[in-house]
UniProtKB/Swiss-Prot annotation:
Pathway: Purine metabolism; AMP biosynthesis via de novo pathway; AMP from IMP: step 1/2. SMART domains: Adenylsucc_synt (SM00788). This is Adenylosuccinate synthetase. The gene is purA. The active site is at D13, H41. GO terms for cellular component: cytoplasm. Binds 1 Mg(2+) ion per subunit. SUPFAM superfamilies: P-loop containing nucleoside triphosphate hydrolases. It comes from Caulobacter sp. (strain K31). Plays an important role in the de novo pathway of purine nucleotide biosynthesis. Catalyzes the first committed step in the biosynthesis of AMP from IMP.
Amino acid sequence: MANVTVVGAQWGDEGKGKIVDWLSNRADVVVRFQGGHNAGHTLVVDGKVYKLALLPSGVVQGKLSVIGNGVVVDPWHLLTEIDKIAEQGVAITPELLVLADNACLILPLHKDLDQAREAASTQKIGTTGRGIGPAYEDKVGRRAIRVADLADPEALKPKIERLLAHHGALRRGLGLPEADGAALFDQLMEVAPRVLAYAQPAWRLLDKAYKDGRKILFEGAQGALLDVDHGTYPFVTSSNTVAGQASAGSGMGPSATGYVLGIVKAYTTRVGEGPFAAELDDEVGKHLSTVGREVGVNTGRARRCGWFDAVLVRQSVAINGIHGVALTKLDVLDGLKTLKICVGYRIGDKVVDYLPAGMRDQRAAEPIYEEMEGWSESTAGARSFKDLNANAVKYVRRVEELIGAPVALLSTSPERDDTILMRDPFQG
């Protein structure tokens, strides 16, 4: 049996939540390894809707769930999410949820900074304003407050002072009032007992699980095109979202992260600012937005929609080392007479088959499309490949050819069971 790493292969919102939930039935442990509570996902289980942003999807299945050291954790949001899920009948105990004791915390001052910067900037990034970026800055700057620090109040006080010395200068430059260190200390001490109940060295637990032969599912957030190194910089998130981060963000060696499953929509969406060559602002774009219900779980922002971009996904396949993909929302294409797939870009007098790193070229890129015949038959709820009409099958096969990876799973509705298994990722 192989472990499985799940990553988004586009700009996020590909349907990772449903696929991870579906795979959780086959896993023993589910691990979040990067990001924060800026990437929400919706799970539909037995008609009940669960909306998660920080908790691993495995909690809904009652599977051991781990928030790894690569995640930045807002302790107040964590407890709120735990309480909300508990109200839906899922008790989140320390036996079910483990929080890496070396994970860094998101504090109120991080949110202040995030929102003030976005408001003051002439170049909007489209941040969620939840403090994720500033929290990662403090982590890299070696001044972050970590989960383990909550267990040592006396040592925490000077760490807060050092942190505020840095943030004070930033806040003054943005016209924000000074942060209150004593108030922050009291806030942290108030939540410390509940947070610390879940904390332990996650890497040790995962190492033992791996050696015991337990199946581990690594759950990525957002998508490869939002990766701080490989995405459409600077319109990216503040962490590495690619499969390689599964190792660093969990404390497990690269050989343990196993089969890489990329999650891919049958079309393309993006939230916030940044280049998007295949974007549509016509009736087809409205169809994708309306039928696909393309609104952000966390922010409520409408997602920008466009045709499937094989150039971007092929690049994601290479960067992530993707073995196979889960193709989601195929049913959203039902009823479209003609489908288009972006197979290259025209930039000035050049034709390229990859996304250039420079923002000028990214913005100038014009899509080169290949057209395919659509279908009128419904694919919604299909649970077998033979249930798909001929044109839908042709579309899936052409996507495989263009991205250089096979389709391992096919999703035909938000319901967990409306999933066609073509190859079990846990079989490697």
